[in-house]
Regions:
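N-terminal alpha-helical transmembrane segments of multi-pass membrane transport
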Residues: 1-132, 248, 271
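Helix-loop-helix connectors at the membrane interface of multi-pass transporters/channels
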Residues: 1-5, 171-186, 211-234, 266-272, ...
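Flexible loop linkers connecting adjacent transmembrane helices
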Residues: 2-5, 37-43, 70-89, 114-138, ...
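Membrane-water interface regions at transmembrane-helix termini and the short interhelical loops
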Residues: 2-6, 31-46, 66-86, 136-143, ...
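Transmembrane-helix boundary/entry motifs in multi-pass membrane transporters
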Residues: 3-11, 47-51, 81-99, 136-146, ...
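Helix-loop-helix module between adjacent transmembrane segments
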Residues: 5-8, 12-15, 19-29, 62-67, ...
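Loop-to-transmembrane helix boundary motifs in multi-pass membrane proteins
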Residues: 6-21, 181-190, 225-244, 248, ...
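Extracellular/periplasmic helix-exit of transmembrane alpha-helices
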Residues: 108-123, 273-296, 357-391
Length: 451
C-alpha cells in the first residue's frame, strides 16, 4: 500500500508549516515586547499546569523502552532481515551525538552544575556547600542523562519501524498509522508532518540562539570582538552558509565528516581539562558520577515539587528542558532512524540511550567539577558573571581562560561549537525535506538547501 502511494513534496505540508512560521515571525517583529510577553505567559501557564505531565510522561517513556529492550521485540531489525548497518559504531555514535546533543554540551557543561551548586534547587542547603554541590550534580546528570535521550529514542524507534520495516513514507506521520489508518496519507497525516517541521524549526531556533550567544561570548573573550547585534547576525549568516554547503554535499560527505570532527574536538577538550586541571578530583567525580546518578534517578524522575518548596524552578529547568527536547524530537528521532537502518531494536535503544548518557556523565563530571573547583579557590570568578549576572554563554570560555594554552583551546572550542551547529542545521534540513517529500534522497539539492 505504502509503495503504491509514493508521496512527493506536498503543498499542504509545505505551505501550512511555512505559513505558521512566517505568521509567528511577523507577529513577533510587529508586536515586539507585547508578543514576547504573550509567549512568556503561555509558556508559564503550560509549565505551571503541566510539569507533572512532562516529568511523568518522559519517565513512563523510559520504562516502556526498557520493556521493549528486554523483550523479544528487541530482536526486530529496522529494515529487512538481511539489511546491514550503513555506518560503523564509532561513526554512528558521532552522528547520533552531534544531532541529539551537540553544542548544548559545551553551553551547559560548566554552567549548570555551577548554577545548582550556587542556588540549590531544594533542601535548604547553603550555597556552594558539599551537600549543594552533590545535589547540583544529581540534577545535572538527570537533565542530561538517559531521560533527555529517551525523548529522541521513542519517535526514532517508531519512525524507523514503520518506514524501514513496514515500508511507509519517510515522514513523521507514518508512526501514527495505527491510529490514523488510511488518513495518514490525507489531511490529518499531512498536518502532523507540518507540525513536525514547525517543531524542528522552533527547536533549532532556540539552539542556534544559544549557540550564537556562546560563539559571540567566546570571540569577545578571545579576540575582544564586541558583543553587538551585527556581529551575532554575521555569525548566523556564516553558519547558515556553511550548513548550506554541507547539506548540498549529502549525508555521507557533510554530516558524517562534521560529526566525526565534532566528537574528536569534544574529546580533545575533555582530555585537556582532565590532564591540566585538578586531575584526581575530576577522576574521582567521574567515578562517583555513575553512583550519584543511579542513586538519585529513581526519585528525581518523578519529582515535580508538589509542595511548592521552590516555585518556578521546574519551569526554568526540568520542564523547560523536556519541552525544548520534545520540539527537537521529530527531527532528531527521524535522523536517528535514518542512520540506524539495519540495526536491531535492541541495538537502537541501547545505542541511543546508554552510549550518549555515559559520555554526558563524563563530560559534566569534568567540566562541572573543574568549574566548581575554580570557584572554590577564587570565589566569584565564575558565579559572578555566569550565575549572578546571567551570562551563561561565557562559562566555558571563562573556565578555559584560566588554563594554559587558552588561545588554542578557546579557538578549538569555538570551532567545535560552530561545527556542531552546522551539523544540526544540516541534519535538520535533510529531515525537514524528508517530512515534506516522504523520500530520503530524491529531492533536488536546492530543496534541502532552501530549508
Amino acid at each position: 500500500m505504502a509503495r503504491t502511494r509514493r508521496l512527493q513534496s506536498d503543498p499542504l505540508i509545505f505551505f501550512s508549516a511555512l505559513g505558521f512560521i512566517l505568521v509567528f515571525v511577523v507577529a513577533t517583529l510587529a508586536f515586539g515586547d507585547r508578543a514576547r510577553q504573550t509567549y512568556a505567559d503561555i509558556s508559564g501557564w503550560l509549565m505551571d499546569h503541566f510539569t507533572w505531565l512532562y516529568v511523568g510522561g518522559v519517565s513512563a517513556t523510559l520504562i516502556f523502552l526498557i520493556v521493549v529492550f528486554v523483550s523479544r521485540y528487541g530482536n526486530l531489525r529496522l529494515g529487512d532481515d538481511d539489511d546491514e548497518p550503513e555506518y560503523s559504531y564509532p561513526v554512528w555514535f558521532a552522528m547520533l551525538f552531534a544531532a541529539g546533543m551537540g553544542a548544548t554540551l559545551l553551553f551547559w557543561g560548566a554552567a549548570e552544575p555551577l548554577n545548582h551548586a550556587y542556588n540549590p534547587p531544594r533542601g535548604g542547603y547553603d550555597s556552594m556547600s558539599r551537600e549543594a554541590i552533590i545535589q547540583a550534580f544529581q540534577f545535572t546528570y538527570y537533565h542530561f542523562g538517559i531521560h533527555m535521550w529517551v525523548i529522541f529514542t521513542l519517535p526514532g524507534l517508531a519512525v524507523g519501524y514503520f518506514v524501514y520495516k513496514r515500508k511507509m513514507p519517510a515522514r513523521m506521520s507514518s508512526m501514527f498509522s495505527p491510529l490514523l489508518g488510511g488518513k495518514v496519507y490525507d489531511t490529518p497525516g499531512k498536518l502532523l508532518d507540518a507540525l513536525g517541521i514547525i517543531g524542528t524549526v522552533f527547536g533549532l531556533a532556540v539552539s542556534v540562539g544559544l549557540g550564537v550567544l556562546q560563539i559571540s561570548a567566546g570571540m569577545n573573550i578571545l579576540w575582544d570582538v564586541p558583543l553587538v547585534t551585527p556581529v551575532q547576525i554575521g555569525i548566523i549568516c556564516a553558519i547558515t552558509l556553511a550548513a548550506s554547503i554541507s547539506v548540498a554535499t549529502g549525508l555521507d560527505k557533510g554530516v558524517k565528516i562534521l560529526s566525526n570532527l565534532n566528537i574528536a574536538g569534544t574529546i580533545l577538550l575533555m582530555i585537556f581539562v582532565l590532564l591540566t586541571g585538578p586531575t584526581l578530583k575530576l577522576l574521582g567525580q567521574i567515578t562517583e558520577s555513575f553512583g550519584i546518578y543511579a542513586q538519585s534517578l529513581p526519585e528525581l524522575m518523578f519529582w515535580v515539587d508538589s509542595y511548592n518548596d521552590n516555585p518556578g524552578w521546574h519551569a526554568t529547568w526540568t520542564a523547560f528542558y523536556w519541552a525544548w527536547t520534545i520540539c527537537w524530537s521529530p527531527f532528531v528521532g527521524m535522523f536517528f532512524a535514518r542512520i540506524s537502518r539495519g540495526r536491531t531494536v535492541r541495538e537502537f535503544i541501547g545505542g541511543t540511550l546508554l552510549l550518549p548518557t555515559t559520555f554526558d556523565l563524563i563530560w559534566f563530571s569534568i567540566f562541572g567539577r573543574a568549574a566548581i573547583d575554580m570557584e572554590e579557590k577564587d570565589p566569584g570568578v565564575l558565579t559572578t558573571p555566569v550565575v549572578e549576572e546571567g551570562d551563561t554563554p561565557q562559562a566555558l570560555f571563562t573556565l578555559l581562560a584560566e588554563y594554559p594554552l587558552y588561545a588554542v583551546t578557546g579557538t578549538l572550542a569555538l570551532v567545535v561549537i560552530v561545527f556542531y551547529f552546522v551539523t544540526s542545521m544540516d541534519s535538520a534540513a535533510l529531515v525537514v525535506d524528508m517530512f515534506a517529500s516522504g523520500e530520503e534522497n530524491k529531492s533536488p539539492t536546492f530543496y534541502r538547501v532552501g530549508w
